[in-house]
Amino acid sequence: MPKFAANLSMLFTDVPFLDRFKAAADAGFTSVEYLFPYEYPAPLLAEKLRENGLKQVLFNTAPGNIAAGEWGVSALPDRIEDARRDIDNALEYALALNCPSVLVMGGVVPPGEDRDAYQQTFIDNLRYAADKFAPHGINIMIEALSAKVKPNYLFASQYQALELANLIDRPNIYIQVDFFHAQIVDGNLTQIIHDLDGRIGHIQIASVPARHEPDEGEINYPFIFAELDRVNYSGWIGCEYNPRGKTEDGLGWAEPWLEKKH
């Protein structure tokens, strides 16, 4: 049975971030994810989780300088010290939040740059991250991003992610499959589920092409959820989509799995 996590970076955005924990719990979610925790002290976030009975299941390493076009620094050859400092900081947050998985962001490869150098830097930094997190039982995620959302990101295909995971070669490295990106880049989602079986550590969902609730568009999510059950996927599924309107009004698709408070 699927386990859904509310993505607090994209859902319940009609209230301030710290109020979204209660909004998610009131809507029936028992777990949450979001992009970046670093604006807030970890103890404050941990208290928000506790007081709302929520589990933190995922967050990302820091994105770098977004205004300058960065989206992660772990693949940037001239930012190795920054990348490892971000990884160390993420570990502190993961421990404080009792979070089982962290997504290490790669980075954008500017046109004309040596992609192989960026890839090797990413591999080296991911080995560093995996080795730092492993003693604590925390998994590291890597995620492919489509050019529609992030042009020139280090890798766009789920099969590139699989190749990188194999090259990194650490037991706590897993692939985070966002079906929004996977459908745009690869398609054939059922085959991806089977080809990556055992290597998928986290999943995210949204409709394609609009990136709204997963009850519209070209992906048959009830079929996808059933297929994930068939391969005994036991991880979380993050709801990383832009609601058509008020988040609560668009959760009808998830009612069979949510634990609404009355």
From Swiss-Prot:
Mg(2+) binds at residues 143, 178, 204, 240. It catalyses: 2-dehydro-L-erythronate = 3-dehydro-L-erythronate; 2-dehydro-D-erythronate = 3-dehydro-D-erythronate. It holds the Pfam family AP_endonuc_2. The keyword Metal-binding applies. One of its GO terms (biological process) is glyoxylate metabolic process. The active site is at 143 (proton donor/acceptor), 240 (proton donor/acceptor). It is an enzyme of class 5 (isomerase). One of its GO terms (molecular function) is hydroxypyruvate isomerase activity. The keyword Magnesium applies. Keywords: Carbohydrate metabolism, Isomerase, Magnesium, Metal-binding. Signal peptide: none annotated. Its EC number is 5.3.1.35. InterPro entries: HPT_OtnI_isomerases, HyI-like, Sugar_Epim/Isomerase, Xyl_isomerase-like_sf, Xyl_isomerase-like_TIM-brl. It comes from the Bacteria. Belongs to the hyi family. OtnI subfamily. NCBIfam families: OxoTetrIsom. Catalyzes the isomerization of 2-oxo-tetronate to 3-oxo-tetronate. PANTHER family: HYDROXYPYRUVATE ISOMERASE-RELATED, ISOMERASE. This is 2-oxo-tetronate isomerase.
